[in-house]
C-alpha cells in the first residue's frame, strides 16, 4: 500500500515539473518573439524612412522638370514674339512701298487723262470731227445692236426659265393640292373614326351607368324591405319574449298554489283556464308562424346577399371594362393629338407655299414690267430712228446713253461695295478683333483717311485674308479680273466716243439751243465726267491691287506656314511634357510596387528562418503581424 501511495505522489510531481519546463520553454520562446518583433519594428521604421527619402527625391525631380518646362515655354514665347515683331515690321515697310508706288501710278494716269481731256477740249478740224462723229455713230450702233441681241437672248432665256418655273410651280401646286386633299381625307376619316368611337364609348358608359343606377335602386329597395322585415321580426320576438314571461309566471303560480280554484273565485278560475288554453294555443301558432317567417326572411336575406355579391361582381367587371376602354382610348387620343399637330404643320406649310407662290407671281409680274419697260426704252432710244435734222433728239439720245453708262457704272460700284461689305464682314468674323494690329499692319489712321481710301483698304485687307484654296477659285479670280479689264476698256472707249459725238453735235447745232439748257447740259456732263473719272480711278486701283494680290497671298501663306510650324512645335512640346508626366507616374507606381515587394520578401525571409529553426509556434503571431 505504501508503494502505491509513493507512486501516486511521484506522478503529480513529474507532471508539475513537466508543466514548469514547458512554461519556461514558452517564456523563452515568448522573449525571442518579442525580440524579433522589436527587430521587425526597427526594420519597418527604416523602410518608412527610405520611403520618405524616395518621395522627397521624386518631388524634387518633379519641381526640376516643371521649372525646365516653364523655361522652355518662356523661351518659345519670346521667340514667337520676336518673329511676329520682325514679320510685322517687314509687312509695314512693304505696305508703305506699295502705297508710294500706287500713288506714283495714280499721278501718272491722272496727268495722262488730263492731257487727253485738254486735247479733246481744244477740238480738231471739221474732217476729223465728221470722221469721229461717223466712228462714234457706227460704234454706238454696233454696241446697240450687240446689246439688243444680248438682251433678246436674255429675254428668251428668261422666258424659258419662267416657263420652266411656272411648270415646276404648277406641278408643285398640283402635288401640294393632291397631298392636301389626301391629308384632309385622312384627317376627316380619322375625325369620323374618333367621333364614332367617342359616341360608342359614351353610349356604353351611359348604358352601364343606367344599369348601375337601376341595380343600386333595386339594392336600396331590398335594403328597405329587409329593414322593415327585420323590424317586424324584432317586434314579434319582443312579443314572444313577453308571452314566454307570462307563461313562466303562470306556471310558477300553478306550482306554488296547488288549488288555485279554491282560492280564486269560480269565475276567475274559469277565465284563467280559458285564457291559459287560448294563450298556449296562440303561443304555439305564433311560434310556428314566427319560425316560418324567420325561415322566409333568412331565405330572402340569403337571396339578397347572393344578389348583392352578383351586383358587386358586375360592378367590378364594369369598372374593369371602363378602365380597359380608357386604356384603349388613350392611344387613340394621343394619335388624335399627333394628327392635329400634323394637320397644323401641314396648314402652315400650305400657307408658306401660298406665300411663296404669291411672291413668285409678284416677281414674275415685276420681271414682265421691267422687260416691257426696257423694250419700250430701247424702242424709243433706237439708233435707227435718228437723223441729222433732229438735233435735240440726238442730244437726248446721247444723254440717255450717258445715263445708261452711268447706271452701268453705278451698278458696278454698288456690286463692288456689296462685295466689299460682304468680304469685310467675312474678314471681321475670321480675323481676331485686335484693332491696334490692323492699324499698325496697314499704317492707317481712322480719323485721317476718307471713305474712298478706307473702303479700298478694307477691300484690300479682305481680299488678302482670302487665301486661294483650290485651282478652281484661282481660275474664277482670273476670269473675273479679265472681265473687269474688258468692261473697263469698253466703258472708257464708249465714254470717249460719246464725248466726241456730243462736242460735234454742239458745234453743228450752234445757236439753235438755249443758253441755259446748254449750260445745264454742260454742267451735268462735267459732273458726269468727274464722277466717271473717279470711278475709273477706283477701277484702276482695283486692277493694280489685284495684280499685287499674288505677292501678298504668298507672304500670307508663308506667315501661315510659320504659325503652323510654331503650333506644331508647341504641340510636340506638350506631347513630350505629357510623356514625361506619364513616365514619372509609371516610375512612381514601379517604386511603390518595389517597396511592397521588399516588404513581402522580408516577411517571407523572416518566416522561413523561423520555420527552419523549428519554431512552429511563431507562425501564428507572424500571421497576426502581417
From Swiss-Prot:
Q: Which domain of life is it from?
A: Eukaryota
Q: Where is the composition biased (Polar residues)?
A: 452-461
- GO annotation, cellular component aspect: cytoplasm; membrane; microtubule; microtubule cytoskeleton; ribonucleoprotein complex
One GO term in the molecular function aspect is: RNA binding
- Protein's cellular compartments: Cytoplasm, Cytoskeleton; Membrane
What does the PTM comment state? Phosphorylated.
Region: Mediates interaction with TYK2 and GABBR1; residue ranges are: 365-626
- Residue span of region Disordered: 1-25, 452-481
Under the heading InterPro entries, the entry gives: JAKMIP, JAKMIP_C
Q: Which family does it belong to?
A: Belongs to the JAKMIP family.
Q: What protein am I looking at?
A: Janus kinase and microtubule-interacting protein 1
Q: Which organism is it from?
A: Mus musculus
Q: Which gene encodes it?
A: Jakmip1
